[in-house]
Amino acid sequence: ARTSIRFRRGHMGKTISQDPTFITPKNYDTNNTVIKITNRAPKLKTLNLPINIKNVLFLTDIHIPYQDDLALNKAITYGLEKNVDCIWLNGDIMDMYGASDHEKLPDHAMIHEEFDAMHDFLGQLRKLFPKAQIYYKEGNHERRWTRLLMRKAQELIGMKEFELNIILKLEEFKIHWVANETHVKF
C-alpha cells in the first residue's frame, strides 16, 4: 500500500505517476480527517562523527567470548597496517549468552566470564590503538543485558552501576558508547 501511495503521489522513479485527484481529492477537508495520530515516535538522537576521521576499522558481530580468533586477529592486523584513526564496534561485540532468553547450556560462559573477556578485549584494543577514537554501538546482543534486568530485576534499571557501558568500563578505556536508538552520520 505504501509503495502504491508513493507512486501515485509522484515520489517514485522518473515516470509521470502523479494523479492530482489522488493527492488532493475534490472537496477534501484537511481538518476533518478520519485518522489523526498526534503521538509520534521520538526522534532518534544523531551522532555526527568528527570530520577529521580518515580511516575507520569496522568490527561487528564478534560475539566475545565465542569469537573466531583467526578472523578477529586478521581484522585487527589490517587496522594496524592501515593505521586507522577510528574503530567502530558495531554491536554484538559480546554475545551475552548468559543474559539471553535461550535455555542455558552448562558448558557456556557465565555472565561474569563474558564481562571479564570483554574487559580483556577492550584493554588490548586500546593498547593496540592508543590514539584511535573508538565507538561502541549497542547491538541486539548487548540489549540482552537490559532485557535480563527487565525480566529479573526491574528495580535496578536506571541505576548507573548496572548500565552496560559502566560495567564494561568504557570510560576507563576512552571508548564512546552509542546507544541502540542513535542515528549515526559518517
Task: Tell what function each PLM region has.
Residues 59, 64-171:
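Core catalytic region of metal-dependent phosphoesterases/phosphodiesterases
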Residues 13-16, 146-147, 185-186:
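Short, solvent-exposed polar/charged micro-motifs at secondary-structure junctions
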Residues 1-58:
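Acidic, histidine-bearing metal-coordination/catalytic regions of metal-dependent phosphoesterases
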Residues 39-41, 69-70, 175:
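Short gly/ser/thr-rich secondary-structure transition/capping motifs
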Residues 46-51, 96, 154-155, 180-181:
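A broad, low-specificity signal for short, low-complexity segments enriched in glycine/proline
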Residues 55, 133, 174-176:
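Conserved beta-strand segments of alpha/beta enzyme cores
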Residues 7, 22, 125, 153, ...:
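Extended hydrophobic/Leu-rich segments
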Residues 167-185:
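Short acidic low-complexity segments
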